[in-house]
Amino acid sequence: MNSLQALIEQAFENRQNLSLNTASSDLINAINEVLSGLDNGQFRVAEKINGEWTVHQWLKKAVLLSFKLFPNQIIDAGFCKFYDKIPLKYTDSSNEQFQQSGVRVVPHAMVRRGAYIAKNTVLMPSYVNIGAYIDEGVMVDTWATVGSCAQIGKNVHISGGAGIGGVLEPLQANPTIIEDNCFIGARSEIVEGVIVEKNSVISMGVFLGQSTKIYNRITGEVSYGRIPAGSVVVAGNLPSHDGSHSLYCAVIVKQVDEKTRAKVSINDLLRANQDD
C-alpha cells in the first residue's frame, strides 16, 4: 500500500468525523491527486491483471470523500450555469488541448472531471460520470450514459439511449465493465457490475443486472453477471416451471470468434435469433 492509498484509506475509515473545515490540507491534496490521476488515465478503478479484473476500492473511496469534503461551486457552461461539487472535464480546454486529446465532443455532451477519455473517441450528446474509463476508438452515442467508475474497452459502440451503470455506492460493488470491440444496442441497460466480455454484441433493449438470468440457447445453461466473449445477446423470456407465467431474461443466441465478428455485420449477427 503506497502512502497516497494509506492516507485515503485512513480518512475513509474516519469519514464520519471529517468535514471541509477539519480535513487536513494533505488529505485534500491527496483527493485532488487521485481525481487528476483518474482524469488523465494514470489511475483506473478497475484493470485486468493476469486475465482477471481487479478493482481498486481505494480510488472509489477517494471519489466518495470528494463528495463529502468539497463544496458546491458555480460551473459556467456558457449557455447556462450549474452548481455542483465536481467540475466539468472540458470547461477550460483550449483548441490545442482538444487537438492533442484526439477526442471529439459534440455540443451538450457532458463529462465530469475524473473521467478518462482516450483518443479517437466520439462523444455525442451524452453523459460520462466521474471515475469512468473510456479507452480508444469508442463511440458514445446520443443520450447514452456511462456511469461512475464504469470501464469501457477499445472500439466499443454504445448506441443511443443506452446506459452503463455506475457503482460508487454500495462501495463493495464492482464497476460495470464492457471489454474491447463490443456493441451495445440502443436503449439497453447494463448495470450492477455486469461484465460484457470482448467481441460481444448486445441487441437493442437488453437489460442486464446481477439478478438477470442469462440463458444460453446453445447449451441450455443459465448464468448471471457475465456475458462470455463473442456472445450475441437478445432480450427474451423464460417460462416458469408450472407454465403459469414467464419472466424476462437475456438470451445468448450465438457465439462467434473474433474473425467472424470482424467480418460479419452487426445486423447479420442479430438475425441469428430468427433462425428458428
Curated annotation (Swiss-Prot):
Record's keyword annotation contains Repeat: yes
Cellular component per GO, a single term: cytoplasm
EC number from the UniProt entry: 2.3.1.117
Pathway in which this enzyme or protein is active: Amino-acid biosynthesis; L-lysine biosynthesis via DAP pathway; LL-2,6-diaminopimelate from (S)-tetrahydrodipicolinate (succinylase route): step 1/3
Pfam families: Hexapep_2, THDPS_N_2
Record's subcellular location: Cytoplasm
CDD domains documented for this protein: LbH_THP_succinylT
Matching SUPFAM superfamilies: Trimeric LpxA-like enzymes (SSF51161)
Residue sites binding substrate per the record: 104, 141
Record GO biological process: diaminopimelate biosynthetic process; lysine biosynthetic process via diaminopimelate
Keyword Transferase set for record: yes
GO molecular-function terms, A-Z: 2,3,4,5-tetrahydropyridine-2,6-dicarboxylate N-succinyltransferase activity; nucleotidyltransferase activity
Keywords for the protein's UniProt record, in alphabetical order: Acyltransferase, Amino-acid biosynthesis, Cytoplasm, Diaminopimelate biosynthesis, Lysine biosynthesis, Repeat, Transferase
InterPro entries the record matches: DapD_Trfase_Hexpep_rpt_fam (IPR005664), Hexapep (IPR001451), THP_succinylTrfase_dom1 (IPR023180), THP_succinylTrfase_N_sf (IPR037133), Trimer_LpxA-like_sf (IPR011004)
Reaction equation(s) it catalyzes: (S)-2,3,4,5-tetrahydrodipicolinate + succinyl-CoA + H2O = (S)-2-succinylamino-6-oxoheptanedioate + CoA
Family: Belongs to the transferase hexapeptide repeat family.
Subunit: Homotrimer.
HAMAP family given in the database record: DapD (MF_00811)
Protein name per the record: 2,3,4,5-tetrahydropyridine-2,6-dicarboxylate N-succinyltransferase
